[in-house]
Every structure is written in C-alpha cells, then in structure tokens.
Curated annotation (Swiss-Prot):
Its cofactor is Mg(2+). This is Molybdenum cofactor guanylyltransferase. Mg(2+) binds at D101. Pfam families: NTP_transf_3. Gene3D superfamilies: Spore Coat Polysaccharide Biosynthesis Protein SpsA, Chain A (3.90.550.10). Signal peptide: none annotated. Belongs to the MobA family. Monomer. GO terms for cellular component: cytoplasm. The gene is mobA.
Length: 194
C-alpha cells in the first residue's frame, strides 16, 4: 500500500500564542485568509485526510468541514499534547503535523518526508539552519512513548523526537517555506512581502 494514502494531515492550532498576546494565531489573516487555512490547503493537496487540533474557537475551525480535535490533556501543554490527542482520536498509522503559523509549507512536504524517512518512526524538517520538530511525519508506534514522556512532565519537542529515534530531513533548498509567524510584527512584514 502507498504510504501517502495512510497519512493523516494535521494542522496544529492548539497553542496559547503567548508571543501573540494570546490571540489565536491560526485565525490571524494573511492577505485576507486565516493562517491555518494556508496550512490546511497545502496539506489537502498532498493528503486525502486532514484534521485540525484546536483548543479554542473550535466552531470557527469546524466551519471548514474538517474534523477538529481538542487536546486530551488538561492545560494544553504544548504541541506534543496536540500530537498525542490526534493519535488517540484518529485511526491512522502515520500523521503529518504542521503548525498553523507556517503558511508557506511546500506542496511536496509529505512526499519528501516519506521518501527520506528510511525506517525512522518520526522525521522532521531541517531548513539548513534550524530544526522544525513540529513539522513532522510521525508513526503511531510512538504514541505510548509520547504519553509516558508527557506524563513525566516533559514538553520539549526536539528532545522527544530524538528520543523516539527520529532524524531530520534536509529542506535547505526550501528554507523560506518554513518561516513561521510568531509576533504581530512578523505578520505585518509578511503582509508587506506577499
């Protein structure tokens, strides 16, 4: 079976957005379109099944027709909790996670991660300068380890990805595709550029 048909795309929109003053980043607009919708659209061109992990404004995300999954852990302790929640509530074998604030993810993201994963249960993007561990292709097999990690109070995404036996995939030729929007000032700069 083709691995691409077994991957569930996931827009991670469950964060607290502290650097954005608590505003739901996924709903901020870039050129008249919510940030999360850019990510969902890019995933839908690559995968047949896409869901959203969101803890606030779920009714707005649901208008898209996509399934919305809330974190199963209290206090929404970060992106790993979103990943775990999706794995607990979706039947898929593989999951391609992307944060809602990366509107320019490439349309070959799933294919490149899939083809370069070797036998790793998790792979993530490296843009030539830095790792992007929340843009990751993850196998369900790591779910028990992830639950244990979170129950131990750990939250560091990169540390977990390495612990799970993963490796980075080089996307240095597409570095600009992984710039994320963390502050209102960054969003304003992107508005001017695009």
């Amino acid at each position: 079976m083709n691995l691409m048909t077994m991957i569930t795309g996931v827009v991670l929109a469950g964060g607290k957005a502290r650097r954005m003053g608590g505003v739901d980043k996924g709903l901020l607009e870039l050129n008249g379109k919510p940030l999360w919708q850019y990510v969902a659209d890019a995933l839908m061109t690559q995968l047949s099944h896409v869901v959203v992990n969101a803890n606030r404004h779920q009714e707005i995300y649901q208008v898209s027709g996509l399934k919305v999954i809330e974190d199963s852990l209290a206090d929404y302790p970060g992106p790993l909790a979103g990943m775990l929640s999706v794995m607990q509530q979706e039947a898929g074998e593989w999951f391609l996670f992307c944060p809602c604030d990366t509107p320019y993810i490439p349309h070959d993201l799933a294919a490149r991660l899939t083809h370069q994963r070797k036998d790793a249960p998790v792979v993530w993007v490296h843009d030539g300068e830095r790792d992007h561990p929340t843009i990751a292709l993850v196998n369900r097999a790591i779910e028990p380890l992830l639950l244990e990690y979170l129950q131990a109070g750990e939250r560091r995404v990169m540390a977990f990805m390495r612990l799970a036996g993963g490796h980075a995939v080089d996307f240095s030729d597409r570095k600009e595709a992984f710039i994320n929007v963390n502050t209102p000032e960054e969003l304003a700069r992107w508005q001017e550029k695009r």
